[in-house]
Amino acid sequence: MWRSAWVNTCFDLEGPHETLRAVVRGGAAAAPPELRAIIEQAPLDSVARAAIDRELFEGHCGKLPAEMVPGMRAAQELRDASMAEALLTAAKGGGPAWLIAGDGHVRADMAVPRMLRRVAPGKTLLIVGVVERGTEAAVPGPEAARQYQVLIVTPPAAREDPCASL
């Protein structure tokens, strides 16, 4: 049985909530020092920042106030840094470490792999994207190649429009 609470606890994805709130308000400067160091070693370029901002805005059904977007991006970077740190810790024994996460966290151009390449350039990464047919990422070409080394395209999942109830 899938236990997302276990995953959230292992990677500390949910918090502590006060840290996430502080980062949303104050940016990476409010992050714990070890995670701030990872974020600072792997700064986002303007293209990646704009892409994350767009995804955050669209992912919140266009309802996210513009002034909150930079803080939400900082929280996304905090989660990515936390996952990168967990992977580096897990790989210290010399064996492989795996991250199974949403595509926003596994993109090579703006998420955990980008951070790992900066803070641990000698590590070998294999970045697999699993995306739904019909999404921008599912289109083979230069954009997909920047994001993943292996791309698996699946049929779209049946779901209600989450924005319809807003």
What spans do the regions from the language model cover?
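Solvent-exposed loop/turn segments at secondary-structure junctions
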Residues: 6, 12-16, 103-107, 132-135
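A substrate-binding/cap region within the structured catalytic cores of diverse enzymes
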Residues: 1-90
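N-terminal start-of-chain detector that recognizes signal peptides
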Residues: 70-71, 98-101
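A structural signal for short, well-ordered beta-strand segments and their strand-loop junctions
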Residues: 5-10, 99-100, 127
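C-terminal regions of proteins
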Residues: 82, 88-91, 95-98, 105-166
